[in-house]
Amino acid sequence: MKQTRILFAGESAAIATTHIKGMDSFTHYSYGEASRYILPKLREQGIEIDYLPCHDVMAKFPLTMEELEPYDCVVTSDLGSNSLLFHPEVLRSHTKPNRLALLRDYVKAGGGFLMIGGYMSFAGVENKARFHDTELEEALPVEVLAHDDRVELPQGFCARAVDPQHPILNGLPEVFPTMLFYNKTLVKPEIGRAHV
């Protein structure tokens, strides 16, 4: 049996914090990968993963269908559209393929795609993820809002399966862990009723 192979892009952040103390200030930097929570769980299921943290996506994310073909699925998580659109050469006024269109075409050709929600997914915080009205939105089963899509729920909420017997939920709990936020999207009319 062929091992499932995915390209997982995102779920990392470089953080700059400035401390202002009257007339004086200092800045310190840190780096974190929230991918450390999900990637081991996927690997436990026998999934082979090639991981690109956010800062590597601009230069290293595939530019051609041939580079995407080895993957059964591409996953983006907390990764805005600009990281996919702006290859470093584009910033030097050289053309490169539109990777949002490439991902759309990859899905049309039968490749899997999953966008995991986050502050830089779908529309995102202050609409900075900006996937509304892009080629990649055409491949999603939902419409991305044209404005900040966050629904913040500090009290927490638990999603429940509407149809726990649906095949896509095989092996998942009927009640999901508590979440504090989600990206609001609209199910495309041609997709029909959501099952989760």
Identify the residue ranges that each predicted region occupies.
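Helical hinge/lid and interdomain linker segments adjacent to catalytic or ligand-binding clefts
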Residues: 7, 23-130
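An acidic, glycine-rich "communication" segment
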Residues: 2, 11-20, 35, 108, ...
